Design a protein with these regions (language model features):
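N-terminal active-site beta-alpha-beta segment that forms phosphate/nucleotide-binding
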Residues: 2-93
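Conserved phosphate- and dinucleotide-binding cores of soluble alpha/beta proteins
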Residues: 83-159
């Protein structure tokens, strides 16, 4: 099986698991993830944070956005309609990036949603920022078929 076939198979398996998650369980698990992030020293110190708009079955991050608003942090939202790095204009340093994905490893490897946007964004725009993957526990796998351009995350937070 080719690397691309492996990625597509894993992506399909994870999508099925994400879609099978009961909405109430998704909310509860999302809250656990957010609570773990809120306890991180790097989160508490971050002043400029890139967030993502979760797709329907991904972890919900509204409590994190609320915390940033309460603290007066600058929030940069990456929307699903942004298909290229040129769709996002950021002028200045970024402290932290919350990163969505389909699958992750414990050592920071990530398989994205399949569009390549976050990979390009992380490679070109947020090199010095702390990169945190946001995932449900079942999205953690032993290994991923990676490409040379894939950017490792500093941390992956789960429920």
């Amino acid at each position: 099986m080719s690397k691309e076939d492996s990625k597509q198979t894993l992506r399909a398996q994870m999508q099925e698991e994400l879609q099978g998650l009961d909405p109430e369980e998704r909310r509860g698990r999302s809250l656990q993830i957010c609570n773990h992030v809120l306890e991180l020293p790097v989160w508490k110190q971050a002043r400029v944070v890139v967030v993502f708009e979760p797709f329907k079955h991904e972890p919900e991050i509204t409590p994190l956005i609320s915390d940033l608003q309460r603290r007066g942090s600058e929030i940069i939202a990456i929307l699903p309609t942004a298909r290229s790095q040129h769709d996002v204009a950021i002028f200045g340093p970024i402290d932290l990036v919350l990163v969505p994905g389909i699958a992750f490893t414990r050592n920071g490897a990530r398989m994205g949603r399949g569009f390549g946007f976050f990979d390009r964004f992380l490679a070109h725009r947020a090199i010095a920022a702390i990169k945190i993957g946001i995932a449900f526990r079942f999205q953690i796998v032993e290994s991923l078929p990676l490409e040379s351009h894939d950017v490792k995350l500093d941390l992956v937070v789960t429920d």
